Amino acid sequence: DYLFVIGFSLGGKYDNIVIEKMAKSAANLASGELLQFEHISNLSTTPENYYSIVDGKTAGVFASACSCAGIIAGANSDVIKSLENFGIELGRAFQLVDDLLDLTGDTSMGKPKGTDVHEGKMTLPLIHSFTILHGIEREQLADILNNFSDDRWQELTTLLVKSGSFEYVKQLIMNHIDRALNHLDLLPESNAKNLMKDIAIASQNRRL
């Protein structure tokens, strides 16, 4: 919330279109938060539901920041759209990395392991695993998610490995980063473009 207040104070110096984009981003963030709340502990959550949440929150904020930067820099509409798409793909990848870190990371990353699982958030690794598994294993996963505690980590990890969910999400991350980098092709060569490439690649490799 604080960062949005600061953002609006800075954005107020620019054209109305920048303020409108920031306002839309804030509204979508709130909508995404509400949608995520609706899907807490909801084992029927689909990948489409997941991406709707992410696009409203993380990816939407990234896209707004990137497109506003283009507008302020005086870029043409094609470049602005490319920057927006870069932000969307980068934001999706960033969130997927965050999902994996919640299941495999450590406290040194600034987020305790298992925060999302404890809160009942249906992240994509969990959604994928629940879709792939069948019979007893699917029932076991449902029981773990509905009655999660730290002593069930090994059970959960075993099922996620068996369903290939870790590798599936890692591949999706690579796909989103590749698409993000492709959206930069329209931009002229510059230090800024190289920095954006570096940021995209670095976000993909956060302690995975």
Identify the meaning behind each predicted range.
Residues 1-208:
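All-alpha prenyltransferase/terpene-synthase fold signal
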